[in-house]
Amino acid sequence: MRLIPLAQAAQVGKWAAAHIAKRINDFKPTAERPFVLGLPTGGTPLATYKALIELYQAGEVSFEHVVTFNMDEYIGIPADHPESYRSFMYTNFFNHVNIQEANINLLNGNAEDHEAECQRYEDKIKSYGKINLFMGGVGNDGHIAFNEPASSLSSRTRIKTLTEDTRIANSRFFDGDINQVPKYALTIGVGTLLDAEEVMILVTGHNKALALEAAVEGSVNHLWTVSALQLHPKAVIVCDEPSQQELKVKTVKYFSELEAENIKGF
């Protein structure tokens, strides 16, 4: 596992965006051989999306031959609801780059048959072989996507009941009213995420410090689903200083020295 310890959340966004752009450019995608990118929603990746848009506008990366798969979607709110993850992605990213509509893949939280929708999504991912890079965030309790504590580490795309903690955390997007936050969501599984060629998790803020500690220094544990990254051959965690508060000083020092060349300029 790689750990990229940076000072501020804005630096996390810029580093992650530069990493994605480099991966896309090195891949040299074409219509027949697209780069497949997994994407999250939430507050943490906003800085990354902003930086990616800037790189696109500067002509440093193109999304013309990039296929995307999002991590999750709420069940029971309209697709055009301002807080649906579909709306989030178009507002904060898709509307600002040259991605083709046909290359955007999102879970349908209003599908009549949720299990069939989850299987369709898994099959669509497999049709591309694999996801080349999956970017994600992490919850205060260590969940990745909506794989809440005690989720199977081999789980696939499925329906999940959201914990009260997650709904409280997400209520900030619903005028602070937990009753407006959906109770269920469709989400990729931990196993789905681990199938990706590379996984990059963004961690910012002191409230994520325990989750980062569990991911880096803890044991692999289904109560902290982010810890499953330890099983991945190509995992990278990009974090800011406040989120590093629970890590041992020697851990941060070790990775700071190891990644010194990759941190330069950020």
From Swiss-Prot:
Q: Does the keyword Ribosomal protein apply?
A: no
Q: Please give the CDD domains that the UniProt record associates with this protein.
A: GlcN6P_deaminase
**E.C. numbers:** 3.5.99.6
Please give the biological process terms from Gene Ontology that the record holds.
Answer: carbohydrate metabolic process; glucosamine catabolic process; N-acetylglucosamine catabolic process; N-acetylneuraminate catabolic process
**Family matches, as InterPro entries:** Glc/Gal-6P_isomerase, Glucosamine6P_isomerase, Glucosamine6P_isomerase_CS, NagB/RpiA_transferase-like
Q: Which GO terms describe its molecular function?
A: glucosamine-6-phosphate deaminase activity; identical protein binding
Sorted alphabetically, which PROSITE patterns does this protein's record hold?
Answer: GLC_GALNAC_ISOMERASE (PS01161)
Q: Which Pfam families match?
A: Glucosamine_iso
**Residue numbers marked as site, Part of the allosteric site:** 151, 158, 160-161, 254
Keywords carried by this UniProt record: Allosteric enzyme, Carbohydrate metabolism, Hydrolase
Note how its activity is modulated.
Allosterically activated by N-acetylglucosamine 6-phosphate (GlcNAc6P).
Cite the annotated pathway. Answer: Amino-sugar metabolism; N-acetylneuraminate degradation; D-fructose 6-phosphate from N-acetylneuraminate: step 5/5
Specify the enzyme's EC class, one word: hydrolase
- Catalytic center residues: 72 (proton acceptor), 141 (for ring-opening step), 143 (proton acceptor), 148 (for ring-opening step)
Recorded catalytic activity of this chain's protein: alpha-D-glucosamine 6-phosphate + H2O = beta-D-fructose 6-phosphate + NH4(+)
UniProt KW RNA-binding keyword: no
CC annotations in GO: cytoplasm
Name the job this protein performs.
Catalyzes the reversible isomerization-deamination of glucosamine 6-phosphate (GlcN6P) to form fructose 6-phosphate (Fru6P) and ammonium ion.
What is the similarity comment for this entry? Belongs to the glucosamine/galactosamine-6-phosphate isomerase family. NagB subfamily.
State the HAMAP family in the record. Answer: GlcN6P_deamin (MF_01241)
Q: How does it assemble?
A: Homohexamer.
Q: How is this protein named in the record? A: Glucosamine-6-phosphate deaminase
